[in-house]
């Protein structure tokens, strides 16, 4: 699988290395799996929501995913667009989001080699500007300048969307200042 295209490791994930049995979880068996979470054996839970259309059901599965991720590494297989983000904490187990088109769901074991480096207290800068209006009304327009880091060797630069956002911001500021 190709990082950033076929799968994304959630930014709050901890590192993990090894080969693990995969247990498929659904709304019928999750509680029995959670009860056995104290058993010391290599295990990853997998939730496949790629065929679920109902938003409420997907929301329930997302809650279940978050509950299970407190006790297990989680594979989340869905049709959702893979998006990178940032986190301000590290969980005990990784969560791997997998594009459903990239994987055959008939696997029973998975091999992982996840390294994680969390930079606590990282400082960044953004720019804020203000144009005084003629009346006592305010319009606040903002854009960010930073980017979202890396996952392994895959970089998530912010230059494209940030440059267009900052450009729009400057054009709006120019327009409203006239």
Residue map of PLM features:
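Internal hydrophobic scaffold segments of catalytic domains
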Residues: 1, 68-83
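Loop/turn elements at helix/coil->beta-strand transitions in domains of secreted/extracellular proteins
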Residues: 40-43, 70-73, 135-139
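Soluble metallo-hydrolase cores and metallopeptidase-like ectodomains found primarily
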Residues: 6, 13-32, 78-158, 171-178
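Soluble non-cytosolic domains of exported or imported proteins
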Residues: 54-65, 119, 159-167
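Hydrophobic beta-strand residues in large extracellular and virion-surface proteins
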Residues: 1, 45, 74, 95, ...
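Mature extracellular/periplasmic domains of secretome proteins
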Residues: 33-40, 61-70
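Noncatalytic luminal/extracellular "stalk/propeptide" segments of secretory-pathway proteins
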Residues: 1-56
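Short, aromatic/basic amphipathic alpha-helical patches
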Residues: 57-67, 85-94
